[in-house]
Amino acid sequence: MGFLSKIMGAGAPTPSVPKAARFRTEPDAIYVPVSVLLVPLDKVNDKTISQGIFGAGAAILPMGDVVFAPADGRVEVTMVTNHAIGIRTADGADVLVHVGIDTVKMDGKGFERFVEAGENVFAGQPLLAFDADRIVEAGFDPTVIVSVTNSDERAVALVAESGTKIDGMPLLKVGEPLLRVG
């Protein structure tokens, strides 16, 4: 965008989409979408999430600012506030990636989405970026929730509890297996 366009307010800046992460994909696996510390879902400070209303899954404390697709699939739902995305995998698992607790109240500030509903995505493709500092400054928790919302129809097992730990919580890297869906 040129100098005059900036002054005149013409056009919106084009978002800079991060490079895709490389995931070694396996069938029936949901992968870590952002480098994280794993937290038991029942320890999340939100009744809806901690009681499993969004389905079986994991709560993760983000150590990055880009959320990558945790599985191959089709984007079924995006939020106008850009804080959550729903993906249906080829085998029918409905995966919700939800950034932050009550961050819907931020009205999209601090979030940038790179995909739209109806798009096919691959594991490792950038879905959205977020500003964790801005989330905290706004008084919210930046915990990322990854859940299988139709877990009442299929088995979901947490597989990412081994490895390096910080304060007793597993340290996970983008692309490592997080959940198995059967």
Model-inferred region functions:
Residues 2-182:
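Contiguous, well-folded functional domains in the mature portion of proteins
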